[in-house]
UniProtKB/Swiss-Prot annotation:
Belongs to the polysaccharide deacetylase family. ArnD deformylase subfamily. This is Probable 4-deoxy-4-formamido-L-arabinose-phosphoundecaprenol deformylase ArnD. It comes from the Bacteria. GO terms for cellular component: membrane. It catalyses: 4-deoxy-4-formamido-alpha-L-arabinopyranosyl di-trans,octa-cis-undecaprenyl phosphate + H2O = 4-amino-4-deoxy-alpha-L-arabinopyranosyl di-trans,octa-cis-undecaprenyl phosphate + formate. InterPro entries: ArnD, Glyco_hydro/deAcase_b/a-brl, NODB_dom, Polysacc_deacetylase_ArnD. PANTHER family: 4-DEOXY-4-FORMAMIDO-L-ARABINOSE-PHOSPHOUNDECAPRENOL DEFORMYLASE ARND-RELATED (PTHR10587:SF137), GLYCOSYL TRANSFERASE-RELATED (PTHR10587). Its EC number is 3.5.1.n3. Catalyzes the deformylation of 4-deoxy-4-formamido-L-arabinose-phosphoundecaprenol to 4-amino-4-deoxy-L-arabinose-phosphoundecaprenol. The modified arabinose is attached to lipid A and is required for resistance to polymyxin and cationic antimicrobial peptides.
Length: 297
């Protein structure tokens, strides 16, 4: 049996309202627990539209047929009107996710704000954004928040340092190959990172694979993964237009003896056995701009 961490990012108002219930239903059907990471502040995702001026982002939107994949309400959210606050409206749904046995962590306060501004925010602004999200999610959940995964994998050494004061069980802030302990600037070791190892739907569709090829492509990649496989889906995609495709993935995975689990299940009993590394900014296939990427020490 191959075990794979299943991470579900919830970025938007509609992804929370429509995508999460749909995913909860299909996961219950297959008796799967996963790790959900919620954005809990304003939905300003439509403000990414200015990035269409960048050829790499424009090509990503075109090859993934973004208008059909996400819907115009997501693509325009927070542009002509103030972004609606996700956690304030859907707290009961977030609690329902927790009560269904899934792991729930923080994705962001303002998903667009983090992706667009994290590189230029001051240390105080960075900490304030994370604190606001943690405070909002803490008020929603019946138990303390124990994990987080920053928006768009926009993380570096400064983000790692900022999160230390929260003493979380783990973070999932970067792309890489296996869980590791990040080296801190004082020479110590930080909170365990569990990187995402596999490509997401929007990173490869229309360029490397078609819809009809996608599930076999991902399952083959899981079986060939020589690290600790972690797969990310999005409530807006696999909980929306690609729900049937995702359900078929779960069915095929069962046939191939691939088992999905929450990311915390991938943590070793003794974190001192993990390798040491760092998170550095780097370009990444299928993405515009930089992402946090695991590097060896």
């Amino acid at each position: 049996m191959t075990r794979v961490g299943l991470r579900i990012d919830v970025d938007t108002w509609r992804g929370t309202r429509d995508g999460v219930p749909a995913l909860l239903k299909v996961l219950a059907e297959f008796d799967i627990q996963a790790s959900f990471f919620f954005s809990v502040g304003p939905d300003n995702m439509g403000r990414h539209l200015w990035r269409l001026l960048r050829p790499r982002f424009l090509w990503k939107m075109l090859r993934s047929n973004a208008a059909s994949l996400y819907g115009w309400d997501i693509l325009l959210a927070g542009t002509a009107w103030p972004g609606r606050h996700i956690g304030a409206r859907f707290g009961s749904l977030i609690r329902q996710t927790h009560d269904a046995g899934h792991e729930v962590g923080l994705h962001s306060w303002d998903h667009h704000g983090w992706q667009a501004n994290v590189a230029r925010w001051s240390d105080a602004q960075l900490a304030a954004q994370f604190h606001e999200g943690m405070d909002a999610l803490t008020q929603i959940l019946p138990s303390p928040v124990r994990c987080s995964a920053v928006a768009g994998w926009r993380a570096d050494a400064r983000v790692v340092e900022m999160k230390q004061r929260w003493n979380l069980d783990y973070n999932s802030d970067c792309r890489g190959t296996q869980p590791f302990r990040p080296r801190l600037k004082n020479g110590g070791l930080g909170t365990t990172q569990i990187p995402v190892t596999l490509p997401t739907y929007d990173e490869v569709i229309g360029e490397r694979v078609s819809d009809g090829e996608f599930n076999d492509f991902i399952l083959d990649a899981i079986e060939q993964d020589r690290g600790v496989p972690v797969y990310t889906i999005h409530a807006e995609v696999e909980g929306g237009a690609k729900l049937a495709l995702f359900r078929q993935l779960l069915l095929l995975a069962r046939q191939r003896h691939i088992e999905f689990c929450p990311l915390s299940s991938l943590l070793p009993d003794d974190s001192t056995t993990l390798p040491v590394g760092r998170i550095e900014r780097a370009p990444f296939p299928g993405r515009e701009g930089w992402l946090g990427v695991q590097t060896e020490e």
